[in-house]
Amino acid sequence: MTTRNDVAQMIDHTLLKPEATTDDFKALIADAVRLGTYSVCVSPSALPVEVPENLHVATVVGFPSGAVKPEIKAAEAARTVADGAEEVDMVINIALAKEGKFDELEAEIKAVRDAVPAPGILKVILETAALTDDEIVAACKASENAGADFVKTSTGFHPAGGASVHAVEIMHATVGGRLGIKASGGIRTAKDALAMIEAGATRLGLSASAAILEELGE
């Protein structure tokens, strides 16, 4: 049985609203400590942030559209690592997946991977709601070939939607057991979170962490 604390240690407690202030990020960190989440995920401009030793720091690159050149994403990623990010969630150039240019997609991810050396963690946001099932599979394979640590469903900002159980199942069937799988975007209830975990998610990107963990109880 998945406990409340099990779920907490799968959560990237997230604040990526463009209008978020320094005080908002401080409150996010305080909440994460109180809730016992695995990490906080903050905007690159918020870095560096002060966190206790047992709380990890994640950020985003090429966010939210992914529509910038690979070298720009790599430079942004390198700067976030220099600013203390331990985990980087990059958004792919979705057009490359839609056009079937998976060699180019792999090269893009590899460029960011090189900017986030181990022990840094690289998560690749596929924006699965905008992709077909076959495109999700191919994008997962490109991510694995490029050396990513995780594949991730969504930014939470795309009009096509956020995470779905179906997408997580496809990702798990493709790279589960070799790469982590992060579900993010539109996960607002404990039922949602548990469904994603059941489908194969090993990490959750949540802004509703407090409400979900309260629902799960002790």
From Swiss-Prot:
Q: Which EC number applies? A: 4.1.2.4
Q: Does the keyword DNA damage apply?
A: no
**Any one Gene Ontology BP term:** carbohydrate catabolic process
Q: What class of enzyme is it?
A: lyase
The protein's superkingdom reads Bacteria
Q: Which GO terms describe its molecular function?
A: deoxyribose-phosphate aldolase activity
- What's one Pfam family the UniProt record gives for this protein? DeoC
**Cellular location of this protein?**
Cytoplasm
Recorded hits in InterPro entries, A to Z, give: Aldolase_TIM, DeoC, DeoC/FbaB/LacD_aldolase, DeoC_typeI
Reaction(s) this enzyme catalyzes, per UniProt: 2-deoxy-D-ribose 5-phosphate = D-glyceraldehyde 3-phosphate + acetaldehyde
User: Catalytic residues per the record?
Assistant: D89, K152, K182
The record's Gene Ontology cellular component field reads: cytoplasm
Pathway it acts in? Carbohydrate degradation; 2-deoxy-D-ribose 1-phosphate degradation; D-glyceraldehyde 3-phosphate and acetaldehyde from 2-deoxy-alpha-D-ribose 1-phosphate: step 2/2
Role noted for this protein: Catalyzes a reversible aldol reaction between acetaldehyde and D-glyceraldehyde 3-phosphate to generate 2-deoxy-D-ribose 5-phosphate.
Name under which the protein is recorded: Deoxyribose-phosphate aldolase
Give the source species: Corynebacterium diphtheriae (strain ATCC 700971 / NCTC 13129 / Biotype gravis)
